[in-house]
Amino acid sequence: MILTRIDHVILAVADLDGSAQLFEQLGLSLTQPMRHKDAATENQVFFIGNESSEFYVELLSVHDRDRALETGRSDLLRAIDRGGLMRVMMEVDDADEARGKLGAAGVTIVQDRTVHRDDGSLIGEVLIPETELFGLDIGLISYAESLVNRCSRHAEGGRFRHRLPLLRLDHLAAFVSDLDATTAAWRSILGVELSGRVEGHGMLIHQLQVGDAVLELIAPDGLDSPVATRPLGLASMAAFEVEDLPSCRSLLADQGFDPNPITQGVLPNSETVVVGGEKLSEFTLQLISFRS
């Protein structure tokens, strides 16, 4: 497998400050705004994890549209206009190996760049492949700093402490037109094996285990399926495991959000609460707990 883990998702937002305030109201602690050197982008993120593993949601915006076009970020501008999750980023250990694997499979790399902080320090190398075979927009990132060091630094900086106690990313989801062909592409090109199948609620789900989280590829089980008319591609959601679902739901309600009642989840022995959508920059946060 050339992918080591699901690193983060990118939520394209028009108003970085306003969107960040919504997530802070939700009970999540975000980093201070940071601009990327020689680019027109700025971000804030929230981390979920511990001293050995992490995942983050990146709120990404543009502070100079003309400069964004000059630097090839028209994809981000389109995503901002559309709203919701733009892309999921997967970590790779070796960017050169990833280039070779993609090239050997005939997959075009549409963006290949290094990313620096505003102070000039190197974040890492980013590859954005064409997405048709994979069913959703993905990117690959190889960091200059090790995961262990990043997690340790973020833990020491309090990045994992939130009023809303999310434990870990459980899964992301994407709706695809050809479930078997898309699953085969993830296996043959990216080295990700099918780890499970789930059926129910009008859906056929293939689970792809990437690190300690899952990417769900979803297709309808028939024309009358409730997901038959869903747009194809990455769903603008992320599911996080929590320990005490009722108390988390109460916290969300107390903060002025309108979470749905606790319901039985699609996954076996699971219960879920959902919040967000239009009230959260077109992003849906799913809280999930598992009965033993």
Predicted regions and their residues:
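A short beta-turn/loop motif at secondary-structure boundaries
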Residues: 36-39, 117, 198-200, 265-267
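Catalytic micro-motifs at enzyme active sites that drive phosphoryl/nucleotidyl and oxygen chemistry
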Residues: 32-35, 73-78, 111-112, 128
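An N-terminus-focused feature that recognizes amino-terminal "leader" regions
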Residues: 1-66, 287
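Aromatic-anchored, glycine/proline-accented short structural segments
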Residues: 156-214, 218
